[in-house]
From Swiss-Prot:
It comes from Deinococcus radiodurans (strain ATCC 13939 / DSM 20539 / JCM 16871 / CCUG 27074 / LMG 4051 / NBRC 15346 / NCIMB 9279 / VKM B-1422 / R1). This is Glycine cleavage system H protein. The glycine cleavage system catalyzes the degradation of glycine. The H protein shuttles the methylamine group of glycine from the P protein to the T protein. Belongs to the GcvH family. Binds 1 lipoyl cofactor covalently. Pfam families: GCV_H. The gene is gcvH. It comes from the Bacteria.
Amino acid sequence: MTTTPTDRKYAASHEWLTQDGTVGISDHAQEQLGDVVYVELPEVGREVKAGEAVAVVESVKTASDIYAPASGTITAVNDELSGSPEKVNESPYEGGWLFKLDVTEEGDLLDAAAYEAQAN
């Protein structure tokens, strides 16, 4: 398990959000999912509310909804995941990001220490 980066905030549902609006899932979440085989990403331009299911990550074990950690508009998606969904496992905090949001309001988010405490 990698160290939880402190440069972002976390939702209790295991998504992370950076200051520039990039969203992904935590290392803890990708470990629980197992090998990711498919990622269904939201449409660019979609308006979402914090806590709304906006994407799906499918693994060999299960499919899991991904929730928006903040309200806003989807501005970009990580198109590389369509051909390489394993990036979610290999690099959950960098190359495995899912989508970007133009944030209008953050949801109920935790700092890294609080997230680690509740995730373990």
